[in-house]
């Protein structure tokens, strides 16, 4: 059956709200290569939206899941617990850059992790308010939609959203927003909208994902830490997209001296299996009463087995170092292209969490059309890319960190061609 035939079946069988970017259908995948049902091959720089830092079907991950399949597939951890969950929590507790002694709880999706981080913060403080940032993306459930700082397409037609959520600007040199602008906005909130002692949490992404790979300045993170300490607010770092070696360190917060109280994780945690988590200061994590956290599939044993494999792969294959090496090669390609492509307004990121932003060279305004044109040129040559950003004018790069050098070089050649056409 052809891609088009599957496409017609999809239109008939599934709702339009589940938007689909590609008009081809996956047949198989290995490492950084994806093959469709017609036999066409693509270099996958989308990686299931940052889920495959260790690549498609890494042999060690497949073996770990197969071994777990022979033991049991589900018990519901809060009914019958299992050792692998506890061991994974111990590993995350030792690795995560959070304040004080740590504890970890596992869930299923990134949105679930963020929802539970807010629950934990509210239980700990007894306060309702949450401050988030414009351009941030935290999920598609109601609380996480409220936290998300972008309306289209995530919020259209779904209001009203949960209250006591407030947004402030996220720093962006390109768009003229300084760290001080962000901090001044928080202080204005305290004066005009909610008193500081009613704020449970400030949540931010150290590198905004859907927002365009904007990197939080160290001064911003330090100031958030000071504000949280001063007012008894819980500091939450959302690492759903940035975690597990993507930025050249295991977590993006490892780039900063200041530590959050809670940190959310998902996506590449289990290499394609549905697993998320919240790790944080033990005293804060213990605020909810027994039964307040959990979920039927939370910490599923197959996904937990995959996560153990992911951590081993990252260590064994030195993927943090690999992320820095590949990211520098990508940056060099983009910076060189910038000299002859006036539409390139900025190249930014950490490690292999790199993005390029496009403006109309005539008007200087953000141009989603240019980003989409380059995305389609690359796709026509077999390179799968994703756009993002508040204006849809950013291309982000999320290749598996396990991609072979020759394939990465081939992707860079396609990217150069797409930028120069």
How should these model regions be labeled?
Residues 1-421:
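Conserved N-terminal phosphate-binding loop of PLP-dependent enzymes in the Aspartate aminotransferase
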